[in-house]
């Protein structure tokens, strides 16, 4: 993982503070928007890599859900909150895990890519390809740098915990190495100013 760490970033390891901060930054609303827009199958098989507190479950109806995160605190919170609605695993998603899992309709990378080095992204995408159904979709959401960006939005994004925030061209370049078809959207948030970038990628 490619992280910045200061006192504020450490505070976000608390599930309550992290959840409150997400709501303040409208992260919950943009997550809901992209999941409702892109997940259409009934009872979908979902793999949520970097699932955090597991809150994607709030916006998906009756999924078969597997969530991975390396934060023990987040995973324990998710297990208590969602109980049998999903399987939550405190470990890295890697080659060993692939053998234990079914094929998925949707794989989620919500707020994950900008925390990874380019080498880590390529390795992760390779593993995702092996786990995704032929007609499945990868859905991503990350902050992005754009031309003529709101100053405050750029300031906030530059202070994100993730150190590998990219432009649209840079994000798409990496995804196109693994996926033939992709649809991308940029969302400019007015209050509090922020810029989000989402991709839906298919084989």
What residues fall within each predicted segment?
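Class I (Rossmann-like) S-adenosyl-L-methionine-dependent methyltransferase catalytic domain
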Residues: 1-100, 116-123, 127, 137-203
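A conserved beta-strand element that flanks and buttresses the S-adenosyl-L-methionine
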Residues: 108
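Hydrophobic adenine-recognition pocket in adenosine-nucleotide-binding enzymes
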Residues: 112
